[in-house]
């Protein structure tokens, strides 16, 4: 079965930890959307909901790949999922960090003027937690992507193709022609 080696114990423990962080990101972002009092939810928080949802979806696609290794278990496809999650988590972390401008949550003047905190210390703390978990998620997916690239490279057949005929290491071996004395 192609791509089975990626499902070692370490990988599953790591992916389960990623799922826990993804769930926390989704829960925090959803709570912020639910608590929004006026003007609808800001797009940056909605994007964070999408980041958490997509990461959970790709976890389950990876898990299904265990049972369908030729379709969803391709190590390059899983590396692509990790890369996309990496980019989404980076984007979400940057967006939330820019939105909250990282001030102290006990500064009432800051809380009242910031559109995202809406005067609430609780929302400020939840936004800071969301920012932290998005950056932590980013780090996890960078590590996962690097590991997955090594797994994918080891699962890919190693053929070298050269423009000049057959040489050592250029492909499958060819039997030599029989000589007259061998007939």
UniProtKB/Swiss-Prot annotation:
Positions in the Extracellular compartment: 30-44, 97-131
A Pfam family that the UniProt record links to this protein: MARVEL
Primary role: Involved in membrane organization and might act as a sensor of sphingolipids that regulates plasma membrane function. Involved in a novel pathway of export of proteins that lack a cleavable signal sequence.
Coiled-coil blocks: none
Family under the similarity heading: Belongs to the NCE102 family.
InterPro entries: Marvel, NCE102-like
GO biological process, alphabetically ordered: eisosome assembly; plasma membrane organization; protein localization to plasma membrane; protein transport
Membrane-related topology note: Multi-pass membrane protein
Entry keyword Phosphoprotein: no
Localization: Cytoplasm; Golgi apparatus membrane; Cell membrane
Protein name stated in the entry: Non-classical export protein 2 homolog
Disordered: annotated span: 163-183
Transmembrane regions listed in the UniProt entry: 9-29, 45-65, 76-96, 132-152
Cytoplasmic side: 1-8, 66-75, 153-183
Any one Gene Ontology cellular component term annotated for this protein: Golgi membrane
Keywords associated with the record: Cell membrane, Cytoplasm, Golgi apparatus, Membrane, Protein transport, Transmembrane, Transmembrane helix, Transport
Originating species: Schizosaccharomyces pombe (strain 972 / ATCC 24843) (Fission yeast)
PANTHER family from the UniProt entry: NON-CLASSICAL EXPORT PROTEIN 2-RELATED (PTHR28165:SF1)
Major localization class: cytoplasm
